[in-house]
Design a protein with these regions (language model features):
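ATP-binding N-terminal substructure of ATP-dependent carboxylate-amine bond-forming enzymes
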Residues: 1-107, 120, 127, 141-146
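Generic secondary-structure signature for well-ordered alpha-helical cores
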Residues: 96, 130, 193-197
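Hydrophobic anchor at the start of a short beta-strand
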Residues: 29-32, 132-133, 200
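Short catalytic-loop micro-motif centered on adjacent basic/acidic residues
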Residues: 8-9, 79-81, 133-136, 201-203
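Phosphate-binding site of ATP-dependent enzymes
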Residues: 178-205
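Short, well-ordered beta-to-alpha junction loops that form the rim of enzyme active sites
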Residues: 83-85, 159, 204-205
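A conserved helix-loop-beta module that forms one wall/lid of the active-site cleft
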Residues: 100-175
Length: 205
């Protein structure tokens, strides 16, 4: 069956594959996907038209790729979907430049930059009385000279995930679940040694 829309995905990990699979299972549609690497779960998938673009996270290149897809599927509504924080951010910040047949179902760039930063997100939760785990914001300058008002296990995750993954260190974890104080300190040292410079969010498990 012919449909009047075309999914356009950005990314290359399991999130992209999962979204593409959902579209394929529901509508029989083959999603177009732009990813940075010729590898990963989405690469060479039979349900994805995967296109390698090393500069995929550059704003100008991102807009060019959207424009190409809009022209290729000129008779359809192109659904621009970022599968990952950096691509969600790009879609939100650039959607005003997209061709008329493109839709990016995101909030404004200003709001996404608040929501995507975990430090700002939890501050917003506090402002509106939304419950969340006990949280301390850690700065690199604190070194090992700090304490937490709760015991292990400790959760540690980057406040700015876009800058975090831009470090390009494959040994970094999305979230650290530390079973001891020593493991927490080692994890923090490892993160900053990898080149990340922003804050870390420490939380009660």
């Amino acid at each position: 069956m012919e449909h009047n829309f075309q999914p356009l995905l950005f990314g290359g990990d399991i999130n992209v594959y999962s979204v593409a699979r959902a579209f394929h299972e529901a509508y029989g549609i083959k999603s177009v996907c732009y990813g940075k690497f010729a590898s990963g779960p989405a690469y060479r998938s039979t349900i994805i038209d995967y296109r390698v673009c090393p500069q995929n996270e550059d704003a100008a290149t991102f807009r060019e790729n959207v424009a190409k897809a809009a022209q290729e599927f000129a008779d359809k509504t192109v659904l621009v979907i970022g599968c990952g924080d950096s691509y969600v951010k790009l879609a939100a910040e650039n959607k005003q430049y997209f061709p008329e047949n493109c839709i990016a179902a995101t909030v404004s760039g200003e709001l996404i930059n608040t929501l995507i930063n975990k430090e700002k997100f939890y501050a917003l939760c506090d402002e509106h009385g939304i419950d969340h785990p006990a949280t301390v914001i850690y700065d690199k300058s604190m070194g090992h000279d700090f304490s937490l008002p709760w015991g292990p296990p400790y959760i540690a995750k980057p406040a700015d995930s876009v800058a975090y993954w831009a470090c390009g260190d494959a040994s970094l974890n999305k979230v650290y679940v530390c079973q001891s104080w020593e493991e927490l300190l080692e994890s923090l040292d490892h993160v900053y040694a990898a080149g990340y410079q922003d804050h870390m969010v420490l939380q009660e498990f």
